Amino acid sequence: MNQAPRVVIIGAGIVGANLADELAVRGWVNTTVIEQGPLHLAGGSTSHAPGLVFQTNPSKSMTEFAGYTVEKLLSLTKDGVSCFNQVGGLEIATTPERLGELARRHGFATSWGLESRLIDPAECKRLHPLLEEEAVLGGFLVPSDGLASAARAVQLLIEKSTAAGVRFLGDTAVTGIEQADGKVTGVRLGDDTVIEADIVVSCAGFWGPAIGEMIGMRVPLLPLAHQYVTTDALPELAGRNPGPHGASLPILRHQDKDLYYREHGDRIGIGSYAHRPMPVDLDTLAKVPAEKMSEHEMPSRLDFTLEDFLPSWEDTKALLPALRERSIEDGFNGIFSFTPDGGPLVGAAPELEGFYVAEAVWVTHSAGIARAVAELLVDGQSTISLHEGEVTRFEPIQTTKEYISEASQQNFVEIYDIRHPLEPRSSPRDLRSAPFRARQEELGAFFLESAGWERPHFFEANRQLLETLPDEWRAPARDSWSNRFHSEISAAEAWKTRTAVAMYDMTPLKRLEVAGPGALALLQRLSTGNIAKKPGAVTYCLLLNADGGIRSDVTIARLGEDRFQLGVNSNIDLDYFSVEARRQAAADPGAWAHVADITGATCCIGLWGPLAREVMAKVSEDDFSNESLKYFRSAEVVIGGIPVTAMRLSYVGELGWELYAGAETGQRLWDVLFAAGAEHGIIAAGRGAFNSLRLEKGYRLWGTDVTPEHHPFEAGLGFSIAKDKTGFVGADAVDVLRNQPSERALRCLTINDGTSMVLGKEPVYLDGSPAGYVTSAAYGYTVRTPLAYAWLPASTVEGDQVEIEYFGRRIPATVAADPLFDPKMERLRG
């Protein structure tokens, strides 16, 4: 048996302690955990965390991380007392809008397999007698939610891991990360000694950015203070909680006022997000000697600012009348970690091989994410997908100090807000735009934001098309929720794309150039496609993990013998290719490949529609006939005097090309195409139409329809694996999966009434029981019906009847053909 690698974990809070235990369970005990504070109470967020665990999350992965945390803490016991008190979690609504949101959250829970139910005000009052029943419109109850004893759990995990052979060092500062040849070699301590290591994992919480700086890594995390108070004793709670946990009422969340509550014996604890954001400069934190560290004195517990809490105190007394004669006995401003998108930061650092992070992880998800990191280290991938929490998911502009501060503070303000899935952040905005932004604004573009990019959703200039839009292209009226960030203009834009020609801004699609003598070998090894084709070939393929999970889907265009252009999904893909290229060059210096992000230096216009060739004939002398430039081929062409790389691809299912040019010529390219297409009725179209058209065509969206937890065959993407290809990452798993019946499949659904809309993540019922969930949905303007894609049992077949639960209402739907539009690909290949 190979000896386990030497692992150093920085931080002995709830994440670091759980990770040490998860590694030990897997036989990795050559581990050292370093904590700058005393081991009995480290002084970070874990030490003052109130411990409320509400498992339900719009993210499937985050809900599953929370579920494992509950499971593990329940099993972590001493003297017959576990580290989790399963009192249940109750979220209440005091406004009609919140009541609807609770129904949506019940849908999330059902989709992800978490037992929950919606309850009336009387049931809320019965479960939590302190409530003012008249103020409550309804509630959402998850019986398995509850209270984590985080500090106690850390102590038991330390005892358990120590017994297994793990070493813990308290009161020990880390001053540097040692490295050689691009790999981590150890951790330097405050006394200048070095602990040698093959792997270092930073679980330093809000101190994480300081650890990241030691290797030149930007950790996009902002420490913010959050208020928590404890009342004096309530006669109503006297003698109610004699047990070791000191709580029996369900944990309570009053999101309409940004508040949450729990019992502390005969007192009530109150947490508030209703105050101003309070960024914390860690350099100003007081140094607390180990001998003085206590529950009331620690670095992460700051002085209470009563004036910030007073509005929340009034809101609390309105909801809990028993507190109207009570007072605040204790309060503090506690430091927690916030990120630009509210997610955790997990995974390998591309800057240094062997360095990992697991930060911005709250108690709720701690054991689940620790297990995922342990699986990542030991097995190479985690059981639960980490794609939403990958530390490398942010674009460079999203890791600047200014962006991290502004976006993280905005997330604090909006933490309990009712957020529509299409709702863009309010700030920061206008960070990245296509070079033809001015033209888009002239056409009245309505922009949504993604990864810092401003992307047109529809164009107000196309409203005039509604006057001549055929009746059969008009969509039924929507409910108020699905109508948000939607415009009927999208119907006209879809109509023009299918019947004439439209221009789509594809500039935000991330583009890489991979070049060098090892480029082909790199791409052949990492992708499922056969890339060894003649220059001009374009290949759609997948990137898999070793288990066959889909880590991304990409298009690879061979522009020259040793030069390729890739369309990828995110910064995660850039870092994956970059790291693998470095490893390849280290093993064989002659097989080097340079990986560059060319997105910002280029632009892309999708020119699609049955009249696209007529437009090209007016602006280029190059041959765009089917014989000259076939489907999934590329060519270097000149359009209006501008050098352009044209790729015969279409994500909307129509004839056309993705046209790539230098950013400096982008506006000129737009103007040339728009002028040439005028006589053919050309329009600019947005993402609203785009999403509808791509779903009609059955095109999957990575990160939404498919993730690393899915494999190609169940996702309907088996065609992207080159026949007889071997030796690529995931090939062994593919051989097994190809001949193994799948338990689930991605199915196309049509809505039976032809009018009701869903948006995604809703539960799907089969024979009256939850059986899956919606991934994407839209109104299909061409196919004249609302449609959705959903993960369902593989036994479902075309014609089967299901129901989609949308805000508590069951909507009948039918399993339909996939795709619904142009299944023979005649329009694309024409």
Predicted regions, residues:
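Beta1/beta-strand and adjacent pyrophosphate-binding region of the FAD-binding site
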Residues: 2-15, 32
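Flavin-dependent oxidoreductases
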Residues: 18, 177-288, 295-303, 311-319, ...
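Glycine-rich FAD pyrophosphate-binding loop
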Residues: 24-45
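Dinucleotide-binding Rossmann-like beta1-alpha1 core, especially the glycine-rich loop
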Residues: 50-127, 256-261, 265-271, 279, ...
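Short beta-strand to alpha-helix junction loop
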Residues: 64-67, 92-101, 140-159, 169, ...
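Helical element adjacent to the flavin cofactor pocket in flavoenzyme catalytic cores
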Residues: 140-199
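C-terminal catalytic lobe of FAD-dependent flavoproteins
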Residues: 256, 281-285, 292-428
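Glycine/proline-enriched, intrinsically flexible loops and inter-domain linkers
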Residues: 389-830
